[in-house]
């Protein structure tokens, strides 16, 4: 049952070695990432890997599922970690904060499996970026676009994305 629920929610947890690779890659960049956003925190794997990094002043971790939020809050993360119970698409719309690093593994939910309100939010994001609605075939697309709106001018987005991201259809439009 849990696997079916995770699939419907687009939850595919990032392997620890992938997170370690991402962490090492960022370390080679020698940047200071003061404010970090994790827009789909899930089970907290990225938080576990990054919470003690000296170059990070604050991590905001957004999670839609209340049960996971409660579990994360009970873990006792350092005080610079803020866990927010919200839909990231709503969070991105409301926040005025900008982040130097946005990192994570967005949900992979095919448009056919999205709830109607999620479809509407995703399409609104496409419109905001003056992109055709036909681009919105999966929730990860909306997450990437919403993340762009939360990013500082010289910031970095580092997401685990599917191969389809490299298809001309996605890369050619903008």
What are the language-model segments listed below?
Residues 86, 101-104, 111-113:
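Acidic, glycine- and histidine-enriched catalytic cores of nucleic acid- and nucleotide-handling enzymes
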Residues 43-45, 64-68, 132-174:
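Conserved Class I SAM-dependent methyltransferase catalytic core
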Residues 81:
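Short, conserved active-site loop motifs that form the nucleotide-linked donor/cofactor pocket
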Residues 93-102:
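A short acidic, Gly/Pro-enriched loop at the edge of an enzyme's catalytic core
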Residues 108-136:
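Mobile active-site "lid"/loop adjacent to the S-adenosyl-L-methionine
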Residues 1-75, 84-87, 92, 106, ...:
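Class I S-adenosyl-L-methionine
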């Amino acid at each position: 049952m849990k696997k079916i629920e995770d699939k419907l929610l687009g939850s595919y947890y990032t392997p620890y070695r992938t997170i370690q690779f991402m962490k090492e890659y960022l370390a080679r960049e020698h940047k200071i990432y003061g404010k970090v956003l994790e827009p789909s925190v899930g089970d907290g794997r990225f938080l576990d890997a990054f919470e003690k990094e000296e170059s990070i002043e604050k991590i905001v971790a957004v999670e839609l599922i209340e049960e996971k939020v409660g579990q994360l809050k009970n873990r006792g993360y350092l005080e610079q970690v803020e866990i927010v119970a919200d839909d990231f698409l709503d969070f991105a719309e409301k926040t005025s904060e900008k982040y130097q690093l946005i990192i994570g593994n967005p949900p992979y939910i095919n448009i056919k499996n999205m709830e109607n309100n999620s479809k509407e939010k995703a399409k609104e994001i496409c419109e905001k970026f003056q992109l055709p609605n036909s681009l919105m075939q999966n929730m990860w697309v909306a997450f990437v676009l919403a993340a762009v709106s939360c990013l500082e001018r010289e910031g970095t987005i580092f997401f685990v994305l599917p191969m389809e991201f490299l298809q001309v259809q996605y890369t050619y439009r903008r």
